Structures are given as structure tokens and as C-alpha cells.
């Protein structure tokens, strides 16, 4: 099994976040749904481990979301 990395996780979550925002969900609900999807795909313990081990998680997450769907991040 391939080790889940922070970049892989954030890219997956970022894509889903944009899709949920495009459906009209707010930021918080979109984020929760996206991480729920990631937990289903990669396993909740793997997702938790990556988040716990990461440094500057918030900065990386916002940067990826702003790149993937700036219309929902930058206002």
C-alpha cells in the first residue's frame, strides 16, 4: 500500500471541497464532507495520522483550495 502524504490528501480534499462548494454548500459543510470522503477512500486512521504529523497544515490546505477554486476562497 502506498503511504498517504499530506499533498495527496490535500489534493483529494481540495477537489472534493470545490465540488461541494459548486453544489452550494458553505465552506464548513464542504470541508467536513470532503474529509469524510477522504476517510472513506484512505481510511480514517491514515487521514488522522497525516493531519497529526503535518506542519503548516492550514497554510497548505488554504493554498491548495485557493488554487483549485479561488472563486470560493478569495473574496
Task: Report each predicted region and the residues it spans.
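Compact alpha-helical subdomains of small soluble proteins
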Residues: 29-75
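Hydrophobic alpha-helical targeting segments used for export or membrane insertion
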Residues: 1-11
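Processing junctions and N-termini across compartments
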Residues: 11-12, 63
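Intrinsically disordered, low-complexity Ser/Thr/Pro-rich tracts
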Residues: 2, 18, 35-39
Amino acid at each position: 500500500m502506498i503511504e498517504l502524504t499530506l499533498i495527496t490528501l490535500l489534493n483529494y480534499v481540495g477537489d472534493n471541497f470545490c465540488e461541494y462548494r459548486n453544489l452550494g454548500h458553505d465552506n464548513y459543510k464542504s470541508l467536513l464532507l470532503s474529509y469524510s470522503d477522504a476517510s472513506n477512500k484512505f481510511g480514517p486512521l491514515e487521514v488522522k495520522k497525516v493531519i497529526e504529523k503535518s506542519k503548516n497544515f492550514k497554510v497548505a490546505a488554504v493554498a491548495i483550495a485557493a488554487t483549485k477554486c479561488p472563486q470560493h476562497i478569495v473574496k
